[in-house]
Amino acid sequence: MMTIQEIYEYLSRFFTPVELIGNGEELIHAPAKIESAQAGEVTFVANKKYLRFLALTEASLVIVERSLAVEEYVGKHSFLKVNDPYSAFVFLLQRFIPPRRIAKQGIAATASIGSNVTIGENVSIGEYAVIGEHCSIGNNTVIAAHSVLLDHVTIGSDVVLFPHVTCYDGTRIGNRVVIHSGAVIGADGFGFAPQQDGSYIKIPQIGIVEIGDDVEIGANTTIDRATLGSTVIESGVKLDNLVQVAHNCRIGAHTVIAAQAGVSGSTTLGNHCIVGGQVGFAGHIEVSDHIQVAAKAGVSKSFMQSGIALRGYPAQPMREQLKYEAQLRTVGDLHAKLKALEQELKALRGSEMPLQNTL
C-alpha cells in the first residue's frame, strides 16, 4: 500500500510537473479500471470517452491530464495531474504488481545442464529445462520449466524465459528481454531451392538470431535464423503473440508488431514503426522509420518516406487508400446507372432499326 502523497512523490521522479489535489494521507491499496474502482483504489483517465465515469467511479485517486478541470469532483476523489496520465498509470502499476513466481530460486534438480556452460549470479533454471553446451546465461536471469537452449546460446542479464521457450543453437539475446511461452527463436528459415524435376532441396540455414536489449516476444511467436549472417531484432522491439519473422529480417529499434503479422525473408522494418494485426510484408523490401501500418494491410513494396501511415492491400499511403475506398463504395451506384444507360441505348437503337431498314 502507498499513501497518495507517496504516489505523488514516486511519480514526480519520472514526470514533471505533477500536481496533487486532495488528501495526500489517504491509503491506496490497488489499481483498478475507472468503471469498477472502489474506495482505496487508484485509476486514470487518458481518453475523453471515459470522462463520464468521473461522476460515477468510487476511486479514491484519479490520475488525469493537467488541462482537465476537476473542481466539481474535488472532495469525492483526489487527483494527480500529469502531462501523460496513461504512462503515469503504467509506472504506478509497476509498483503494485506482485512479483511473478516463474521458477524456483536456483537450478532445479531435473534441469539438464551441458558442459562448458557459464551461469551468472542469482540465476533460476526451472524443472526439466535443458541447457546445451557452451551456453552463457547472465545474472538474475530466469529460465522456466521445459525451456530449451541448444548449444552456444548466449543470454544476457535480467532475462525471463517463460515455460516451453526454445532457443536454437547460436541465438544471442540481450539484457532485460522477456520471451513468452511457446516462442521459438532460431528455427530454420524457409529456404528451398527448386530443381528442374519440380522437387526442392533444402538450403542450409547457417546464420543466427540476434535480439537486443529490452525486447518482449509474445507467446507462440517465431523468429527464424538467417541463411547467412543474422536475423536481427533491435533493442526495444515488442512482438505480440503469433508473429512470424522470417530469415535475414531486421526489425528496427522500438518497433511494435501486433498479433498474426508476418514479415517475409530479408525484409527490413525501420525504427519506431507500428504494425497492426494480420499485416503481411513481402520479402526483400524496406520500410522506413516511424511508419504505421493498419491491420490486415499487405505491404508489397518498399516505402522509404519516414512517418507515413499505410493501409489496404496492396498497401498504399493512408490518404490515397481512403480515397480509393470511398470511390469503391460508389461502384454499386455506378453499375446501376450504367445498366440504365445500356437499356436506354438499346431502346434508342431499337427505335432506329425500321428507319435504317428502309434506306
From Swiss-Prot:
Its EC number is 2.3.1.191. The active site is at 247 (proton acceptor). InterPro entries: Hexapep (IPR001451), Hexapep_transf_CS (IPR018357), LpxD (IPR007691), Trimer_LpxA-like_sf (IPR011004), UDP_GlcNAc_AcTrfase_non-rep (IPR020573). The keyword Acetylation does not apply. GO terms for cellular component: membrane. The keyword Transcription regulation does not apply. It catalyses: a UDP-3-O-[(3R)-3-hydroxyacyl]-alpha-D-glucosamine + a (3R)-hydroxyacyl-[ACP] = a UDP-2-N,3-O-bis[(3R)-3-hydroxyacyl]-alpha-D-glucosamine + holo-[ACP] + H(+). Pathway: Bacterial outer membrane biogenesis; LPS lipid A biosynthesis. Keywords: Acyltransferase, Lipid A biosynthesis, Lipid biosynthesis, Lipid metabolism, Repeat, Transferase. Coiled coil: none annotated. It comes from the Bacteria. Catalyzes the N-acylation of UDP-3-O-acylglucosamine using 3-hydroxyacyl-ACP as the acyl donor. Is involved in the biosynthesis of lipid A, a phosphorylated glycolipid that anchors the lipopolysaccharide to the outer membrane of the cell. Homotrimer. Belongs to the transferase hexapeptide repeat family. LpxD subfamily. This is UDP-3-O-acylglucosamine N-acyltransferase. It comes from Chlorobium chlorochromatii (strain CaD3).
